[in-house]
From Swiss-Prot:
Stored Gene3D superfamilies: 3.30.300.20, Nucleic acid-binding proteins, NusA, N-terminal domain
Pfam family of the protein (one): KH_NusA_C
GO MF terms, alphabetically ordered: DNA-binding transcription factor activity; RNA binding
Single GO BP term: transcription antitermination
Keyword terms of this UniProt record: Cytoplasm, Repeat, RNA-binding, Transcription, Transcription antitermination, Transcription regulation, Transcription termination
Organism: Helicobacter pylori (strain ATCC 700392 / 26695)
Name under which the protein is recorded: Transcription termination/antitermination protein NusA
Record keyword NAD present: no
Amino acid sequence: MEKISDLIECIAYEKNLPKEMISKVIQGCLLKMAQNELDPLARYLVVEENKQLQLIQLVEVLEDGDERLVNDPSKYISLSKAKEMDPSVKIKDELSYSLSLESMKQGAINRLFKDLQYQLEKALEDSHFEAFQKRLNSVLMGQVILVDHNQNTFIEIEQQFQGVLSMRHRIKGESFKVGDSIKAVLTQVKRTKKGLLLELSRTTPKMLEALLELEVPEIKDKEIEIIHCARIPGNRAKVSFFSHNARIDPIGAAVGVKGVRINAISNELNKENIDCIEYSNVPEIYITLALAPAKILSVEIKKIPIEELNAEEKESIQERFIVNNHLQKAKVRLLDIEKSKAIGKGGVNVCLASMLTGYHIEFETIPSVKENAENESEKETPKVGVEALESLFKN
């Protein structure tokens, strides 16, 4: 028993586990062995004294002649026999017997150590599982060890764990080879027969948020905060920031001097263009900022009950625009010459603005001043030549 106790500190150091956890595992294995190898009906207890573990069997003192002495002899002892061991003992008292591993069969000892090894490995896996659960949505870095025929990229992380970056979680246009170093966000921790499997992603908005936190110390220090993040991975992204410190410009902090911070993040994300905007809790202002670089004239917010939408509208509207059974809709007025900027190439700008703000955006265009002027001039035929000269002298 002393040898097992001495192992606790050694195992705790080697496996980087708390000594209390190791002790609990060993105690559980000892109790299991006693019930399997000695008597499954008996009551056992493991106690720790002077850094040594003792396996103890507990018996209750009963009056002589009690039927339970015959039915469950492993749980009870008669008063007369108990007094031979301790004259001061009384009925319903508990006596304890110390059991020795040396008195057990070698097969039982072997099974104990085999079970102990299994339980320790399980405890170690549980510890790692809990540790990685706390690191969800954080950036992990590793080295590519395999790219399979489905283009799933397997990554060695911290020299002992395996991560997988599936093709659908890779930025479009990216390719990796064995030996490459990769940064990716941890999205899920799975248990498999081979151990833990860490699922990674480079396309989730959390990847951009995590990189910003690493690159911008003001975010980690909670002086500025990321409010919303929307991405079309590898193409473009929009991030809104709020400053908790009046002296800090959130956009300047995020972008960095000469764009050094945001450019470093963009390079990590395969040259993804990142728009940084200041958050506003006024929806009209927020939507106006989100649609930059387009210049917006006005924004009208409407919250339409779902039951008022027709079948076609219900089918086309995305769930993220529905809040409390109301469609969040923004009617944006702008000059016609600004509409292409607001929509963006392939609709990217308006799509990201909608994702960022949570509003379904519709546009209403207004003819530009230049166009109005041209229309007015077309109504009058310009006078030229002699006719123009004559008009100068008319009263």
